[in-house]
Amino acid sequence: MARSPRRAGAPRLQLPLLCLLLQGATAILFAVFVRYNHETDAALWHWGNHSNLDNEFYFRYPSFQDVHVMVFVGFGFLMAFLQRYGFSSVGFTFLLAAFALQWSTLIQGFFHSLHGGYIHVSVNSMINADFCAGAVLISFGAILGKTGPAQLLLMTVLEVALFGINEFVLLNLLQVKDAGGSMTIHTFGAYFGLVLSRVLYRPQLEKSKHRQCSVYHSDLFAMIGTIFLWIFWPSFNSAPTTLGDGQHRTALNTYYSLSASTLGTFAMSALVGERGRLDMVHIQNAALAGGVVVGTAGEMMLTPFGALAAGFLAGTVSTLGYKFFTPILEAKFKVQDTCGVHNLHGIPGVLGALLGVLVVGLATHEAYGEGLGSVFPLIAKGQRTAMSQAMYQLFGLFVTLMFASVGGALGGLLLKLPCLGSPADCQCYEDQVYWEVPGEHEDAAQGPLKAEEPDTQA
């Protein structure tokens, strides 16, 4: 049945109107609230007695560059494995991250850098905003191919707000340690997306099952994303940590953990694979689990051996998750996790939080010496014992899971609004629904889609 002109025109205007509305509202809020901080304001910086080389830009910007590449290149290409959804994977990653970094600058600014009624921004604001965008993209991975761009933008509005609140509760109120974001980024983003996917469950998704797979070149593009993420992950985990030994130690622990998770992934993939063959899905994803698992404990005295052990465990568990748990997740729990974020970010994120609990509980003055104050200031001041700090870390994990679950459920209800126009079951994982695809005539490409029922939407 042909759509009425009104219904046909609505999706055409939906995305541009929403983009204009969100950008306009954000710009107004920036004009009212956002100002340069003392290291970026020309008058304030030159008023002080210091060298230009003392500016924090020179210490933080290299890390920011690496994080920026991870968000826009790494995540985008990692999700480009679907044979008919490469434009959307990379393009919608670009769109969501570009909006999320603006919106999160405001949300995080209200919680962390509001002084005199203004939000003061710096290179640290850019790093933190990219971290928030990373959490959004993790959630995007769980619902990849099953939602439209307007739905994704509204998801970003809600998730960024909840991310900021959860981060404030953990880092400021509970004062837990989570520099690399095992809890605030990976666990939150994964379970927000998984609950969202459960609410948006599509019982008739089998109609698009033939497109929910990769081809040789799409897997190769995804592997490019993996390599970018793998190379820059030490910068990701160490970017917000204390300059000096803390940042150095975080990068080192992440470096070793990633290498061990890669070996664990190859070993387990060959072990569980048919006739001992490697599965590219495992290599693309589980090899990165080592970066996730040391997100919390990376700046602590984890030891190089501890980093290797944690990384190997994460890579092994993640691979087993892709092989055995993902099918159960869909069949028994009705969670259609397109990218397997539960295996790459969810389980390793929880393991990383628990690893943090263990390492914090073992912290002593003898192990940290004078550096105890920079890693665990409350323990150094005698306001908390190592065990009580460990309990706060554990409570922070539960708080994160609560915010993610409630937020994902609310997001799912929001995205189910009929006016948002999600793709039909037979049109999921298909670029041509939203993009001009070169070399394909629209009627020829859409022919098989139109033969299916068009109104079975989430």
From Swiss-Prot:
SUPFAM superfamilies with a match to the protein in the record: Ammonium transporter (SSF111352)
Annotated glycan sites: N49
Topology of this chain in the membrane: Multi-pass membrane protein
CC per GO annotation: basolateral plasma membrane; plasma membrane; spectrin-associated cytoskeleton
Region named Interaction with ANK3: 416-424
Catalysed transformations (reactions): NH4(+)(in) = NH4(+)(out); methylamine(out) = methylamine(in); CO2(out) = CO2(in)
Pfam families: Ammonium_transp
Transmembrane segments: 14-34, 62-82, 91-111, 125-145, 152-172, 180-200, 220-240, 251-273, 280-302, 307-329, 344-364, 394-414
Motif placement: Basolateral sorting signal: 429-432
Highest taxon of source: Eukaryota
Subcellular location: Cell membrane; Basolateral cell membrane
Any one GO BP annotation for this protein: ammonium transmembrane transport
Molecular function as annotated in GO: ammonium channel activity; ankyrin binding; carbon dioxide transmembrane transporter activity
UniProt-recorded name of the protein: Ammonium transporter Rh type B
Annotated organism of origin: Canis lupus familiaris (Dog)
